[in-house]
Amino acid sequence: NNEVIKTKNGGVFFYDYYSKNKNVKTHASLNHILSEMNYLYELYLATNNEDYLNMAELIKKALDETRNSWIRRDGVYRFRDDLWYAVYEGTDGSLQFKDLDYTKTLTYEDLKRASDNMLKVYGRTDETINILLESKKKFLIKEGFDIVEW
């Protein structure tokens, strides 16, 4: 199926865009993944329509399964603790996390928004979101960004 990236536990990531050539798979960037999940949680909060919640939870399930893979632990010290920009599905079905997150603080802001949405929906913060948020924050502070707490 070329329409979504499926994780082993049944979670999904939607591609950022699709090619006219059905055989070409693109990628799912973390900031798009978070924006889609946030949008679905916010639709659920506005409407109480469980279809939105169920879809948000499929994305969240994929994030839970892959959370450690998003955190950069490659040999490039400067980018240690940053988050990879995107996930790609290999021809063998494996997930490959790569590319520099050029968005600077956008992904961090999306993670803060996700944390806020989790609190509203579930009444608590979320471990996966907290781990990604803290890692991105650590990287941004090291890079000299002024991080504003919420």
PLM segments and residue spans:
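Carbohydrate-binding/catalytic loop surfaces
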Residues: 5-29, 72-110, 149-150
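Compositionally biased, intrinsically disordered low-complexity regions enriched in proline and serine
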Residues: 16-19, 42, 53, 89, ...
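Long, well-ordered core segments of solenoidal/helical folds
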Residues: 1-9, 51-76, 119-150
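Well-ordered alpha-helical scaffold segments within catalytic/enzyme domains
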Residues: 35-49, 91-103, 107-124
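Eukaryote-skewed repeat-based solenoidal scaffolds used as protein-protein interaction platforms
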Residues: 1-67
